[in-house]
Amino acid sequence: ADEGLADRTRVVGDVMVDVLLDVARRPDDDPLLAGRLPTSPYVLATIHRAENTDDPTRLASVIDALASIDAPVVLPRHPRLRDRCAAAGISLEGGNLNPIEPLSYAEMVWAVQGSVAVATDSGGLQKEAFVLGRPVTTLRTETEWVETLAGGWNVLLPGLEDIGATVLRPAPTSPRGTPYGAGDAAERSLAALAAF
């Protein structure tokens, strides 16, 4: 407000939501994705942040917790995760883990759409899962996207307690709303610029 821009500021939404929804509307017929995801209900998990991977004890706890979830857990091998597990002698093959090679952006969107839930420490994936209507469990103490916490769509679980029940909780019935826009941020931006 001190800059004197309040009268000229327009909230139009997040153009990344525009991209997400555009990709989500495309057919998920990528032959590279075929056969890489379970046909039964699965959880999509991603782990790569330093707070979950740099300490071998914490990393082992996270991997063990994910492996204990009572559903297949698809876990793309992020390079940091792969390297830290290899250095610590931690296997990604145990329990219900289904480790796969990293996914492209479109493949990740389709994997979220096919999942029943998401468990992650990724900032972007929290928001994407929320926008796509999947319950997300964030394995961190905080989120950049506080709007995702409303109604229980995103639950912070840094301590990993009751991870199975938390990750596999029923999808909330509360409306998510569109705090990041409805997929029309680009058009709204152009309209706002044209109106100046």
How would you label these PLM feature ranges?
Residues T137, G152-L156:
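A short acidic/histidine/glycine-rich donor-binding loop in glycosyltransferase catalytic cores
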Residues G95-S104:
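Active-site donor-binding acidic/aromatic loop of nucleotide-activated sugar
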Residues A1-T53, T57:
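A nucleotide-sugar donor-handling region in carbohydrate enzymes
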